[in-house]
Amino acid sequence: MADTLTYNIIATTTLGANAGSVTFSSIPGTYTDLVLVSNVATTSSTNFGYYLNNDSANNYCVVNMYGNGSSTSSANSTTEGALWANWSNYTSTTVGNSIYISNIQNYASTSMYKTVITRGDFGGDRKSTRLNSSH
């Protein structure tokens, strides 16, 4: 049986220095879903998030669940300015590198809200699952 790819890589970037933002543009609307995999270095006072279609208005709803192995917590908001992958409420001041995997369902649809599920490991002691949607 021949190997087949589950995903097609349509864009990548590797930064040579710190950057406040990265833009992926001209993503074709021919796919159903997108998967964004990020390796991000942040501190406890920095949020990591992204916008869909350059929309930075308070058009995003988020539900966040996180834990550190001995305790759990959750938070939500209906008026966020981005699809945040994390919230700045860590137990240490330097988090280090964090891996996030975001699944963006039906991203090209114009007839429904965008739903994004992001899972992350904050490089410290917190693990997170986050459900985001745009409205």
Set out the residue ranges of the language-model regions.
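Positively charged, low-complexity/disordered segments
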Residues: 131-135
